[in-house]
Every structure is written in C-alpha cells, then in structure tokens.
A protein has these predicted regions:
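C-terminal lobe and adjacent flexible extensions of AdoMet/dcAdoMet transferase-like proteins
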Residues: 217-275
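N-terminal, positively charged/glycine-rich alpha-helical extensions of SAM-dependent methyltransferases
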Residues: 1-32
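Class I SAM-dependent methyltransferase SAM/SAH-binding core
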Residues: 53, 59-104
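Conserved alpha-helix/loop element of class I SAM-dependent methyltransferases that forms part
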Residues: 28-51, 65
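A short glycine-rich, Lys/Arg-flanked "PGG" loop and its adjoining helix->strand segment in the class I
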Residues: 128-140
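A short SAM/SAH-binding and catalytic strip from SAM-dependent methyltransferases
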Residues: 113-125
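A short acidic, Gly/Pro-enriched loop at the edge of an enzyme's catalytic core
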Residues: 103-114
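Conserved class I S-adenosyl-L-methionine
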Residues: 143-175, 183-185
Length: 275
C-alpha cells in the first residue's frame, strides 16, 4: 500500500525547523498566534487530566503551550524536526515523541481525549485520508482542531491571482538546494512580507480596515515569523488548498460533527467533535 507521505516535503520541513527552531520567537508572539488557532477550541468539554496528540508538531512551538494544560501530549512528526521538538520541550515531563507519519502513527485507536494538526495536512498527498487517520485515534466526544490552507473562497479574485503568481515562484524555489532556498525565502520575507505587513500596521493605527491587504495578518508579527512562514510557504514542495465547504466535507467524512470554523485569519481553522 502506498504511504500517505511525500518524503521530499518531509525532508524540506526537517531542514526548515533545523534553521528556524523557534528559539528566537518572542513568547508573547507565540501566545498571540496560538490564541488565533485555538480561539475556537472547546477546552470546556475536555475531561479531567486529558491525553491528546499534536500531529506534525515540527519544532514543538504549539506543544510547548498545550502540554502545561493537559495530562499528557503525544508529539508526532515524521521529519528530523522531532529532534528540535525534543530539545525545545526537554523541561516538560508529560510529553512523548513519535517519529511517525500520519497514516501509521502507533497511538491506539479511540484512546485520545483531543487532537490537533496545524498547518500540516495540506502537505500530504491525501488530506482527507489523513484527517480520517487522526480522528480514528479519538474517543467519542473528543475534539479535533485542524488548520488547512484556504483556497481564497472568501476573498476577491485579486487574492487568487496573487496566489497563482506566487505559486509559480514556490514551484521554482521549492526544488532548490537548501542554502539557496533560504536565500530566496529570506529575500521574499524582507521585500514582500515586511513592507506589506508594516504598511498594514500603520494603516490600522490610522483607523483603516486592513483585512483586504495581502499579508496584513503579519502586522503584529516579528520578522523572524515572517522568515519562518516565507520558508514554509515558498520552500515546501507539496502544497494543497481547500475551500471551507471542502474542509467541512472531509471532516464530516472522518466522523466529526458540530464543526465550527474560525471567522478570523488564518483561514481555515476548524474544529469538530468525534461522533
């Protein structure tokens, strides 16, 4: 059976997190972005001393904030980034690490009280199958939070056009050697992300709504985050995008109900409850 994994993409992420291990990420900024993702997460339905998993944990930046809130957290990643996560989370005693892929991670089925996968499952060949693999590990009534790249279904055609142009650059940059790839993605962060985000910040302070400005999401972020996300966006070989309806359909097909979407950036972030 063909595995639901793209090894070139896995290797790319290992390189990314080795370079951007998040040690330079300000704590307050990490919490700000964390709250963006978890604003819709139903903490109140978790049982006492919950056990869950972080699928595609990367450097462990979200696990670092989740682990203190739960009894145990499984950090799962198929790439060498897991070594970075082990280092970053070394002071936490309630975390375990599994260097495994989404279609074969060894957690027992129907054993977890919650799960999440943020910015990961759009980088596997079959996203729908990957979501099903995640939900198979959940107990009935357990929440699953996912963040998948949106297909600009809530944006103007202009956004879609910009993405199509940028995707041409991604296809070229993503096949470059690591060092050259970093040069190009850092340049994009400096000449594209930084100006647009700072212009958005100035306009917002003047009372202007900036949601329609590309990359305005980064107006409160550091240049370090921009470099990280530029590397993620332009340096990754496999990328898929989905509409809200497509994500909802995949989640329902995976046995999730009461699906809720965040109406704020980043899009789309959704949570559902295992039936």
């Amino acid at each position: 059976m063909k595995k639901n994994i793209d090894q070139t993409t896995v290797k790319s992420f290992g390189d990314e997190w080795d370079r951007f291990d998040q040690s330079s990420l300000p704590e307050e900024e990490a919490e700000y972005v964390f709250n963006k993702y978890f604003s819709i997460f139903p903490w109140h339905i978790l049982p006492e001393n919950p056990i869950g998993f972080d699928l595609g944990c990367g450097s462990g930046r979200w696990a670092k904030l989740i682990a203190p809130k739960v009894a145990h957290l499984h950090c799962i990643d198929p790439s060498s980034a897991l070594n970075i996560a082990k280092k970053n989370l070394s002071e936490l005693t309630n975390v375990s690490f599994l260097q495994e892929s989404v279609d074969s991670f060894s957690i027992e089925k129907e054993s977890q009280d919650f799960g999440y996968s943020l910015g990961v499952l759009h980088h596997v060949p079959d996203t729908s199958l990957a979501i099903k693999s995640c939900t198979s590990k959940l107990k009935s009534g357990a929440p699953f939070l996912v963040y998948l790249y949106y297909d600009f279904d809530n944006r103007s055609p202009f956004f879609k056009f910009i993405w199509r142009v940028s995707d041409l650059f991604r296809r070229m940059i993503s096949i470059m050697p690591p060092r050259l790839k970093h040069v190009f993605t850092d340049a994009i962060a400096f000449f594209v992300y930084l100006p647009l985000s700072r212009i958005s910040k100035v306009l917002e302070k003047s009372g202007v709504r900036v949601d329609s400005i590309p990359l305005s999401f980064y107006r409160h972020n550091s240049f370090y985050t921009m470099r990280t996300d530029s590397r993620d966006r332009f340096g990754t070989p496999l990328e898929q995008r989905f509409t809200r309806k497509e994500i909802e359909k995949m989640m329902e097909s995976a046995g999730l109900k009461d699906i809720t979407f965040s109406e704020e950036t980043p899009f789309w972030c959704a949570v559902g409850i295992k039936t």
